[in-house]
């Protein structure tokens, strides 16, 4: 019961933090920081797929060194496969798994285990959320399910932020096209269109 409570509290905290974000970059950063802190992991990273290069670009990270983050490109179709296959991938020993693209860099960084889950929006994989631990970790189904839920929330929040920014940009464009005078207050009231005798 204690662990269930911890998972619930963590999910609530992460959701509340993400809900206050205004852009996709902020969503990624808050997600990485919240997951790293909540799991007391070594680090957490959020990757987004570049459809042109077929690589996963780093969107945000917390707890990992710049040297490790700059280790090289992460191939969408090659490394680990959580994004490509749309399934979570739990690796107990990163030094003994052929799916790890940069094992030496992981060893130098002090990474023992890794959990990667896809970030999905509108049934399409847009990236991956990865949790790194310094000690060997047998990720339980509860761990995996929680990280999947957070990744899902992250994907939805990013999508909403993009829509909001696009909507805001469209309004600004319309204002510029029509002129600011058009949008000045015309003194409308809740009784607009109602006969004066009724409004009184």
Regions inferred by a protein language model and the residue ranges of each:
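Acidic/proline- and glycine-rich, intrinsically disordered low-complexity segments
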Residues: 66-89, 102
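Sensory-domain boundary capping and coupling elements
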Residues: 119-133, 157
């Amino acid at each position: 019961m204690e662990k269930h409570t911890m998972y619930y509290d963590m999910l609530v905290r992460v959701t509340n933090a993400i809900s206050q974000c205004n852009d996709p970059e902020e969503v990624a950063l808050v997600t990485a920081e919240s997951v790293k802190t909540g799991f007391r992991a070594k680090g957490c990273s959020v990757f987004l797929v570049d459809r042109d290069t077929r690589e996963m670009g780093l969107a945000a990270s917390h707890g990992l060194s710049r040297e490790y983050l700059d280790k090289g490109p992460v191939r969408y179709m090659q490394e680990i496969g959580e994004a490509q296959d749309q399934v979570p991938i739990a690796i107990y020993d990163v030094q003994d798994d052929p799916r790890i693209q940069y094992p030496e860099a992981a060893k130098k960084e002090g990474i023992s285990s890794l959990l990667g889950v896809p970030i999905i929006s509108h049934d399409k994989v847009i990236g991956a959320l990865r949790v790194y631990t310094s000690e060997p970790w047998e990720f339980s189904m509860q761990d995996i399910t929680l990280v999947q839920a957070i990744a899902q929330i992250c994907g939805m929040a990013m999508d909403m932020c993009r829509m909001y920014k696009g909507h805001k940009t469209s309004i600004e464009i319309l204002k510029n096209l029509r002129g600011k005078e058009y949008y000045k207050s015309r003194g409308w009231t809740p009784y607009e269109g109602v006969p004066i005798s009724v409004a009184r």
